[in-house]
């Protein structure tokens, strides 16, 4: 038997000694990517994974994603913490040593005392200049914007936070707009058919 043929037979067995595996042919994609032009073009049109939205909508205010650098966790007792675990550890240690009072005093921003719980979520404040907001009843500071998931007394007096509007247009508006466009397109097709039919009628006469 031909030794080359014998090698082909035993190439599927990895324990065979002195076996020369068949060289794999380079794919067309790798050949194209080896060229500098195609490599640059593939990088240009490659979809970015985990892309952030272009704008973040809260109520009627749009924020660029570059302005949000993470939640600034400010404790109701005056100190800042980098994480939730650190804040919980400091609060629990202070509570065990009887340093903290049982009922913290209410602040000016929270007259009802709903956000004074030691284990409640502290507000994440995004400091911006000249931010216009549409408040109901009370006017908030222009440099404080409260995000979703935290107490915001200026948003709703009942304590319930409204949903964040992430879409520029609603679904009903998009459906109506699409229906109007379809109707206009059908009218244009009918007008075009009438013009063509009239032109053929004149030529036949």
Curated annotation (Swiss-Prot):
Give a Pfam family name.
DUF5435
Recorded hits in InterPro entries, A to Z, give: DUF5435
- Which residue ranges does the record annotate as region Disordered? 72-114
Positions with biased composition (Low complexity): 101-110
Q: Which domain of life is it from?
A: Viruses
Composition bias, kind Polar residues: at what positions?
90-100
Protein name, per record: Uncharacterized gene 2 protein
The protein's organism comes out as Equine herpesvirus 1 (strain Ab4p)
């Amino acid at each position: 038997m031909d030794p080359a043929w014998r090698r082909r037979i035993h190439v599927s067995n990895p324990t065979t000694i002195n076996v020369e595996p068949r060289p794999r042919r380079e794919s067309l994609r790798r050949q194209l990517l080896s060229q500098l032009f195609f490599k640059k073009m593939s990088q240009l049109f490659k979809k970015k994974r985990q892309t952030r939205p272009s704008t973040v909508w809260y109520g009627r205010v749009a924020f660029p994603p570059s302005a949000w650098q993470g939640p600034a966790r400010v404790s109701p007792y005056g100190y800042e913490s980098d994480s939730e675990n650190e804040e919980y550890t400091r609060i629990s240690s202070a509570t065990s040593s009887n340093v903290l009072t049982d009922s913290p005093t209410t602040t000016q921003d929270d007259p009802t005392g709903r956000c004074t719980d030691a284990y409640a979520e502290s507000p994440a404040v995004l400091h911006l200049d000249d931010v216009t907001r549409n408040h109901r009843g009370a006017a908030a500071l222009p440099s404080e914007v409260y995000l979703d998931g935290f107490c915001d007394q200026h948003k709703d007096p009942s304590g319930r936070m409204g949903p964040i509007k992430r879409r520029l247009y609603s679904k009903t508006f998009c459906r109506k707009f699409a229906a109007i466009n379809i109707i206009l397109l059908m009218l244009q097709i009918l007008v075009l058919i009438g013009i063509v039919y009239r032109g053929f009628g004149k030529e036949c006469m």
